[in-house]
């Protein structure tokens, strides 16, 4: 398996973990009765749960680009050291982004986000 596909697998695992953590803290902050019910009415959640939700939404905004780039690189066989480094940068920056966002660290969070975009750029440039 290519480096890019390996990091795609890691990104999928991160997505599942992120969803589980976010859902757990959201349910805890809203109450077990709400979590087990139809959830028709909106309820306030804790700051922590809200940050987890926004961090997940942010991850979902960049993940499709990563999936597409990793797939194109694997299918076309155009993987290079640069694309592998881009995949690693994207993944590890996204891992770093979660605790930075949840703990409210603004500057480092933004740096992690930019590094993840730089990783996507490193993956895309050799394909052009």
Question: What are these model-predicted stretches?
Answer:
Residues 10-13, 56, 88-92, 111, ...:
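Hydrophobic residues within alpha-helical transmembrane segments
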Residues 43-64, 100-102, 106:
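Membrane interfacial helix-start motif at the N-side
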Residues 78-89:
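Structural signature of hydrophobic alpha-helical transmembrane segments
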Residues 23-53:
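Cytosolic, membrane-interface loops and tails of multi-pass inner-membrane proteins
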Residues 1-21:
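Long, highly hydrophobic alpha-helical transmembrane signal-anchor segments
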Residues 14, 57-72:
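Core segments of transmembrane alpha-helices
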Residues 95-118:
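Interfacial loop-to-transmembrane junctions
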Residues 118-128:
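Hydrophobic alpha-helical transmembrane segments in multi-pass integral membrane proteins
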